[in-house]
Amino acid sequence: MSKKIYSVITGTGSYLPTKLVRNQDFLTNTFLESNGEPIKRPNEEIISKFQQITGIDERRYIEDEYVNSDIAFFAGEKALASAGIDREALDYIIVAHNFGDVKHGSTRVDIVPALASRVKYKLGILNPFTVAYDVPFGCPGWLQALIQADYYIRSGDARNILVIGSETLSRVSDPHDRDSMIYSDGAGAVVVSAVESEEPVGILTHVTRTDTAEQVFLLQMGQSFNPEKGDDLYLKMNGRKLYEYALKTVPTAIKTAIDKSGIPITD
């Protein structure tokens, strides 16, 4: 049996911010409806219902002195150490994010230069053929970046790729929007390497979909529910609709991927 090239995760790394924010920390927030009117329920009730639905009772926020590319770098450094490879041997660095570097106290998005280029710089990589680029792809961005890495490796174009997913949603969340409790910050990274094998190993199949007919604006940028915040833009979502969408589509996508792999679901 002839050998084929497969993509295998050979190293992992992550960064978990140290700033811990518990649900009770939102008790003093002034939560508003989208029309700017106060929500006519006590914060205790709002928070209790949120925890009941999501199971979330705490989250991490990035430290004031860092930005997104910093924590992406921290995770990437750990992944390279875990893989034990020469960083100059990387063919690609792919960073999945949506808002770039947003400084503490600001909502201004900074995506030039690309976060992947900033990470490459912070890693001290001098190889000009280590191609660095970003993937802005919403919540599943890291998975889509991993899929792209898999294509590069299977084609023979690359041998080692650093894939990072990093986000600092706390910097673009509206404190007057109850949905802000679901957002948090952090970074994760993997090194994906080419492995020749007679048997399938590593990444076997994938499924991706983009639904826009009714869902395109379930996540969007919008002004604060507090008119006094002015024209600054914050991440807004239709939480209930997104929840219903996930329940409907994610299991189907998982089942399709399993079927494509040929692996029985019982395994």
Q: Where would I find each of the regions flagged by the language model?
A:
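Condensing-enzyme catalytic core mediating Claisen C-C bond formation in acyl metabolism
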Residues: 1-65, 176-248, 252-256
